[in-house]
Each structure stands twice: as C-alpha cells, then as structure tokens.
Amino acid sequence: MIVEENKEMPPLTAIILAGGRSNRMGAGKDKAKLNLGGKCLIDIVISRLQPLVGDNLIIVGPPEKYPAYKQVVPDLFSKGSPLVGIYSGLKASFSLYNIVVGCDMPFLEVKLLQYMIENINSNDLVIPRYGAGYLEPLCAIYGKRCLEVMERNLVKDIFSVRAIFPYLKVRFIEEEEIKKYDPGLYSFFNINYKQDMIRAEKIMDSRRESSK
C-alpha cells in the first residue's frame, strides 16, 4: 500500500524504540529480533512504517545490537524509560514531525497512522486515547518542539510522558476515530510476554487465512 505524500508536510521520520529490557520474555531474549511469521519483529515494524516514511528511520537502542541498520542511536540518559528513548530519537531526527513506535508492535495499521499524520496541523503531539483514558505514547507523533519540555523534565528526573502534556499543544485521537481505521485496536498490541508472542502468531495466521 502506497500512501500519497502530503505536499504541505515535510518528510516524516519514524523512530523505533528498541532499547528496553526484555526480561519478561526470558533471560537473554532480544524481543526486537524475535521471529514472527519468518521475519523478526523489528523488520515487521519497519515494513509497516516504510509506506509513510520511506527510509527515514531511526532505531533507538544499543548500536552494537543492530549493526545491520542504517541509523541507530543510543539513549542519551542512563535511566531507561520510554521518554528517554523518545527524546533520544527526536534529538537525532532532522524531521519536524516524527512517528514514534515500539519495536514489538507488529500490527501497526498504516491507515490509522496516516490519519494521525493528517491531524498534525499546528499540534506538537498527536496521541491515541482509548478505553478509560488510556494513552499510547509509543504509537504517536511528536514534533521537535517537544524536545525542550522533555529535556527540562529529564534533567529533573521526571520520566513520565504525561508530564509533558501541559506545556504542549496535544491532539488526542479518540477511540471512535481510531476504530474507523483499526476496529480491533491491533495497532497497540505489543509483545511483553511469551503468551503475547503466541497470540501474535494466532493473529498472523488468522490474517493469512482471511486473505486467501
């Protein structure tokens, strides 16, 4: 699927966070490289993002773990947290706006991401909100203007993504909007446990069957 380029929007970059520990998957497991349907998770995620960003991709994680990828940057703060990863990726990006996702989200819906891009306008952050107000910071679009607020919080050891919201112009994508493009909310499915991997395999098998 090729998404038409928005002539008014400068090129976006996708930032994939791959620096988190995978302890819940078992000792020594790098979940970014887990095999799902014959491909490793991070490559599946990249394939979902490329129709939107082409080769404008940044992986945030230990560079020595991902030598085969073009641009890999480490976390810029020693404290491991999603906010640190997001900040590190934004700092390395030349794009005004950036799609940020986790490396373990194999069912990202391109149409939903495209809708989010269309809602950037003059916002600093576009983020899904569903259920009882649950936010998905690792399937969101961040503008470079977020950097100043993030850095101010990080140097104060404030690692909550929500803590940056009061200082930014935020567009929440509500559940009703999300379900127009992703009725099952599969874009937000991520893999933390072995059971999640089993479920992901079943989802992938089901999709293969339905496409026959």
Task: Give a label for each model feature.
Residues 8-145, 151-158, 166-185, 202-207:
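Nucleotide and nucleotide-moiety/phosphate-recognizing core
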Residues 7-8, 212:
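Intrinsically disordered, low-complexity segments enriched in glycine/proline and serine/threonine
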Residues 187-212:
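Short, basic/aromatic-enriched C-terminal tail that caps enzymatic domains
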Residues 2-4:
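Intrinsic disorder/low-complexity segments
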Residues 161-164, 212:
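Short glycine-rich, low-complexity/disordered patches
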Residues 160-162, 188-189:
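An accessory alpha-helical subdomain
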